From Swiss-Prot:
This is Multidrug resistance protein MdtL. Keywords: Antibiotic resistance, Cell inner membrane, Cell membrane, Membrane, Transmembrane, Transmembrane helix, Transport. Disulfide bonds: none annotated. It is a multi-pass membrane protein. Pfam families: MFS_1 (PF07690).
Length: 391
């Protein structure tokens, strides 16, 4: 079992590493490519677009051909794209490389969640996804620090060679450690079960909405945090870095505690707790009389996301034993596109950073609480499949 957990964790971590590691080198990249930092900030959106594009096909291919045939090309593409970015001499080539990086990371991301659905029952999957969420929270803190240390001695291209090295490690794991977990092709007797695994299932759609809103909350916070903390609250850059590190610490602590909480409380209780924390955070930020109270509200955001997201993802994948790849892709596309659409619309309409965050917190909590309370799981399916090793 440990091989599946190690491989799944490694496959997922390419996604945040690709986002966060290069940011520290952005000024130097812009200078070398004769582009402005503002022009290269679009590299974040291009990367997410690549991920979304990969998710359009990766899930279906993973369900038809297997998890390894998607993970291996995905990791290989991430390696090639990282090298391509390091060799880019224009901003156009650099952005093209970032899109290809997103494609590779998206393939790996989809496969990771499908593997966990294949190999773990509901309760263990919820615990593992909570742990995975905690580990993922480490990357936004460690990746820029690692990038800074690398750039003390080496040029910015070394950041992408480091990402390529990470991709090589994932490729080796996918080739030699990961065993195929895709359930055997359905027989005629399995057709009714396969047909019943509809993406239009009310319970699945409710969890898609809940997880998409939750990701929108956390990405809105990440995107608005420089404005909130440095411009509105007046913290210095060093203080900002310290606060963000502390919020990551809160996220990790809660994520690592959630598996123990699942041994005591029902998953539904933790999901309700998550949304209550979001609602409390929104109200706290709306009426905050001081910076200290506002910072407390921010910690509630991190705690709320960490306690509920892994559980909600596990519930979303639960109904799918034969179409786990497609379900994972659908979740990923909804989360990436939904959160990006909200942030873009809020900026176009002219909603300020503070109100943008408060608005999504309150909307997420109210909508999600209603869905949790009124949309119950349907008929249970097999919790996980026996692992079949394919030649």
């Amino acid at each position: 079992m440990s091989r599946f957990l190690i491989c799944s964790f490694a496959l997922v971590l390419l996604y945040p590493a690709g986002i966060d590691m290069y940011l520290v080198g952005l000024p130097r990249i812009a200078a070398d490519l004769n582009a402005s930092e503002a022009q290269l900030h679009i590299a974040f959106s291009v990367y997410l677009a690549g991920m979304a594009a990969a998710m359009l096909f990766a899930g279906k291919v993973a369900d038809r051909s297997g998890r390894k045939p998607v993970a291996i090309p995905g990791a290989a593409l991430f390696i090639i794209a990282s090298v391509f970015c390091s060799l880019a001499e224009t901003s156009t080539l650099f952005l093209a490389g970032r899109f290809l990086q997103g494609l590779g990371a998206g393939c790996c991301y989809v496969v990771a969640f499908a593997i966990l659905r294949d190999t773990l029952d509901d309760r263990r999957r919820a615990k593992v996804l909570s742990l995975l969420n905690g580990i993922t929270c480490i990357i936004p803190v460690l990746a820029p620090v690692l990038g800074h240390l690398i750039m003390l001695k080496f040029p910015w291209q070394s950041l992408f060679w480091t990402m390529a090295t990470m991709g090589i490690a994932v490729l080796m794991l996918s080739l030699f450690i990961l065993k195929e977990t895709r359930p055997a092709a359905p027989t005629n007797s399995d057709k009714p079960r396969e047909n019943s695994e509809s993406l239009l299932n009310r319970f699945f759609l409710s969890r898609v909405v809940i997880t998409t809103l939750s990701v929108s909350v956390i990405l809105t916070f990440v995107n608005t945090s420089p404005v909130l903390l440095m411009e509105i609250m007046g913290f210095e850059r060093g203080e900002y870095a310290t606060i963000m590190a502390l919020t990551a610490g809160v996220s990790m602590t809660v994520s690592f505690s959630t598996p123990f909480a699942l041994g005591i409380f029902k998953p539904r209780t933790l999901m309700i707790t998550s949304q209550v924390l979001f609602l409390a955070a929104g109200i706290t930020l709306a009426v905050s009389p001081s910076h200290a109270v506002s910072l407390f509200g921010i910690t509630l955001i991190c705690a709320g996301f960490s306690v509920g997201f892994g559980v909600a993802m596990s519930q979303a994948l639960g109904p799918f034993s034969l179409r786990a790849g497609v379900a994972s892709s659908t979740l990923g596309i909804a989360q990436v596109c939904g959160s990006s659409l909200w942030i873009w619309l809020a900026a176009v309409v002219g909603i300020g950073a503070w109100n943008m965050l408060i608005g999504i917190l309150i909307a997420c909590s109210i909508v999600s609480l209603l869905l949790i309370m009124f949309v119950a799981p349907g008929r249970p399916v097999a919790a996980h499949e026996e692992i079949h090793h394919h030649a």
